[in-house]
Amino acid sequence: AMKKKSWLGMALSGLAAGKWFWWGKDAASFKAIWIAMFDYFKAQGLDNLIWVWTAETGDEDWYPGDQYVDIIGSDIYSKDVETCASRYVAISATYGNKMITLSECGSVGKISEQWAAGARWSWFMPWYDGEEEDGAPIVHADEAWWKDAMGQSYVITREEVPSME
């Protein structure tokens, strides 16, 4: 047991339905692993975990179930504002009782423009810049994107989150 209560987000097995990783073999196996991990952590007394499931288009059969998921995430790369907003709307229509997050993103429309278009992400996490094998730069969130995001009244930083004690 923890002496001081804090919260930890568990974004397990991202991009499962994409079949890029070993946990993406099939929906039944993925759900069995997710539920087994959920039950194990709960049995160990870890009641402060926030379970984040990453949705992909057309993967509803991979969803572990409302009792095992707290927040629905979406990973979006190289998409315009309209695409991001339509993805938010689609997830909201399917999982309307859950918070929705932009769990990974890169080269997407500005947060202010997404918000205006109806994408009310609970949080967002841009992937950091890097470079291609040939040395060409990959920019996922440039300075203008960050200034826009941090300049919005509805965006708060970790330092601004109220204490849960």
Predicted regions mapped to residue ranges:
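Substrate-binding cleft of secreted/luminal carbohydrate-active enzymes
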Residues: 98-165
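Substrate-binding surface in catalytic domains of secreted glycosidases
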Residues: 74-100
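Aromatic- and acid-rich polysaccharide-binding/catalytic face
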Residues: 59-81, 125-127
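Alpha-helical scaffolding within the catalytic cores
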Residues: 54-63, 82-90, 106-115
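N-terminal catalytic cores of secreted or lumenal carbohydrate-active enzymes
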Residues: 1-3
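Alpha-helical scaffolding segments of alpha/beta enzyme cores, especially the outer helices
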Residues: 29-40, 86, 90
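Aromatic-lined carbohydrate-recognition surfaces of secreted/lumenal glycan-active proteins
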Residues: 7-17, 34-60, 97-108
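Surface-exposed cleft-lining segments at the edges of enzyme active sites
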Residues: 15-28, 74
